[in-house]
């Protein structure tokens, strides 16, 4: 069974989704929770049997799909993808568990199960076409979730979401076909296997073009400034569960793909584009933070702050050293937990008041103390308070980039502090002061079902903030392999310098992480 | 005194005619049956046609076996040419016809199917297409083309609605113009080279090194225009949406596949040597027409309010996409053409069949046209299975993995990449993105809007019978599980295309 655990993880939810059509409407919620829990337990088991001392791929499976054209179903997991898979399973579980009263709940749960298949598939795929397959397929359930259960502008938002990503990914597909063609020219064999591509050293001019092609696909997904305009719409219109999954998992596909594809395939191009991308990332951090401050809608605040933090992830990724990349991967998890939780929290209040305008609230801390507490913890995590999960990721990302450029890191760091302002302002508007609105006086505090979703998230936020080692260890091992691959593959002198050789830095890195936490 | 010609039967190699003769004999058989006992039920003719096509398919498989053993077969004074292209395209022609013909067994009675002539004409048309693809001779191509087209005009007109007559007449006039262009173009080449055989023309032109380039240009322009009409390349496409709208949905789906593959094969035979002749302007003309066809058809499809018209424009766009294969002109691209078209047949026939089963006998008051977008609003609520299948076909047409057409698109774009047409590859990719919008539009209507009129869902399968559902089931399975067969299909097609020297 262990040989096929990844395939089981990928296809179990889909199979369960198909069978779900038979399940009665009244029992579908329990069915969904049960399936998602099994999936989560399987994912935890994967972590348990995962050997964290191995840097390469584990539990690899290979089935020939179109061998004449070099397309095979290859899946595998390493420290980089492991935790995102677990996160995906986790969020589907608590997402389904916390699902409020929804119309057509059966369709929703089946859709979520299919979405889970595509999410796990993206992070486990080791063949570019299989990756592309799940990547594209993930758009469909999300399109349906936003379009069918969303707000008044839901159709515009869902179509915009679909077309933006679809257009970007098609450019990426051309890039993938080129990559396979270069591999064919070099070896005489077609292959779309990522691990095969890793061995291919491309001239710098090719790298630049291919990097741009892949960048189009990934940057729209992340979404990076200036391609971010679809995201506020999608978040603004999506139902709570849609926003949670979108922010926690789907956006991570883009940042994950940067680490899986762009960096190891095109190390020279990554160095070449390091500063432009870092500048974009910093614009993203500052600009979206300012936009977030101007929002009246609390969900938009969370949405923009989520984009803002994605900028830090990009910055860490393009630090191109072990600290930065490890930090960015950790931050992906952290961002998933925290922004997912924030969207859930916004959903809680929306369920009660059917409005998301902050001016409608005020003094909620008196009425809903438990809600206010959890919101407060998540908010502190979001602004990156030490001893919360986000701090570890942000700190490492910035530390990584500090080695490349002091000034840009300083800018980014300041921006993150500024980010605290809008979050605190939003918190103040909503929770402090006196209760002004009559409707707010008798709001019910979070109920058991909501606590079931929120308490685990709170615990994770604090636990991994204090003791991030269980995650950092395996991530670090795999990232070291990626960075040393990049160092070996890079052609130009500048790239060799920018991407440090791991062997030399190893002692430096492992020690601080070991002691500090 | 003329001495009697002395020809041995062996040298005629009549086996090359067998696949065409089977539908012809079948058509005559149907007429004879009608002669003895008229007023038979349509199911008899449908099943007879299906059986005849089945026999034809087996005969083709035999021919394919001979081809893979001995290579290209010539026959009947070397007029017939059975090479890989001929065999592959005949497989598509006959296979798609077999999928089409059971669609006549609708729940509602449409009167064209009560005539045995419909089925006889249908089989004659297939024979015409088969002749068209299985020869190198411009005259026989012309004869095949006209046989098939004339039969097709009649089939459209038999739908017996005002719009059908309009469509048939429009198609007829446009077809006549195209035929004129074709014969004129052929004449120019005959005048230049003294031959109507494409390989002879190529050899002679090659030998004198394209000395009369001006005349070659004239000939090519006429031929291109004539294929433009047949393949509905922009700007010769204007008839397509109207004709599709006028004919029954099933026939429209059929027209988007079978006549086009026949025309593609002929275009491939003619333009193959011209592209490789190194005459730059030809490449430019083709490049431009490919890009314009893809892009403009997509843009027009965006603004349609009727699903059938949208699908008409979408099939124009797909034709432009596939035409790129002829421009690229490598073995991979030519294989990609057939590969794409096989997958396209499944998906497109499936989606037109979905329109066909929702066809009402009379137009309700609140509907502008037979298949307006509004009709499909909120379909997921009332007919979830049908809506899901329709969405599946739309996603496949949009090129979403892992559905059938994605593999075709991927292979086609890859052939552009390997053929050195980087910009074209990008244009093709971006066009797929544009196309995503209008396919998505139907999905949005079906899944995200509320039903406009309460109809209880029976509208969407008003016309459904077991045989229609079977065809849709086959198309859906072919669309979903294409990835299982992609490898074998690709190997098979590539071997055939490669062995015929394209």
Ranges and model annotations:
Chain B
Residues 1-502:
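Alpha-helical transmembrane segments of multi-pass membrane proteins predominantly involved
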